[in-house]
A protein has these predicted regions:
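Extracellular cysteine-rich, disulfide-bonded domains and loops characteristic of secreted proteins
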Residues: 81-86
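Structured catalytic/translocation cores of nucleotide/phosphate-coupled proteins
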Residues: 3-6, 22-28
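Active-site-flanking beta-strand signature of metal-NTP-handling nucleotidyl enzymes
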Residues: 2-10, 46-48
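An amphipathic, aromatic/His-enriched active-site/gating alpha helix that lines ligand/cofactor pockets
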Residues: 25-35, 50-80
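A short beta-turn/loop motif at secondary-structure boundaries
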Residues: 37-42
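Short, surface-exposed ligand-recognition loops at beta-strand->loop->(often short) alpha-helix junctions
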Residues: 8-21
Length: 87
């Protein structure tokens, strides 16, 4: 099964570039087969990692950044693939 972990944070005012740099620097062990980082208005950063694992597998996650970088707490979601064939 393919599992996607989503991590989203909104930076404190004027700290979007720092939050993006921090998120990109977070190494996961083991590294996921696929990882993408996105940005959006209001200094939001989204990281999605894809894993070949059962839905409830113990997978490494990006931690919460230092509080001074955040406008609000980090949001996290876990999704399982709905494709019958799966990648």
């Amino acid at each position: 099964m393919t599992v996607a972990l989503m991590w989203e944070a909104r930076a404190a005012d004027g700290r979007g570039a720092e939050l993006l740099e921090w998120a990109r620097a977070q190494a996961l062990d083991p590294a996921p087969p696929r990882r993408e980082t996105f940005t959006a208005p209001a200094d939001r950063v989204l990281v999605i990692t894809w894993w070949d694992a059962p839905y409830d597998a113990d997978l490494p996650e990006i931690p919460s950044p230092p509080e001074e970088l955040l406008h609000r707490p980090v949001h996290r979601w876990r999704f399982g693939s709905a494709d019958a064939d799966g990648p």
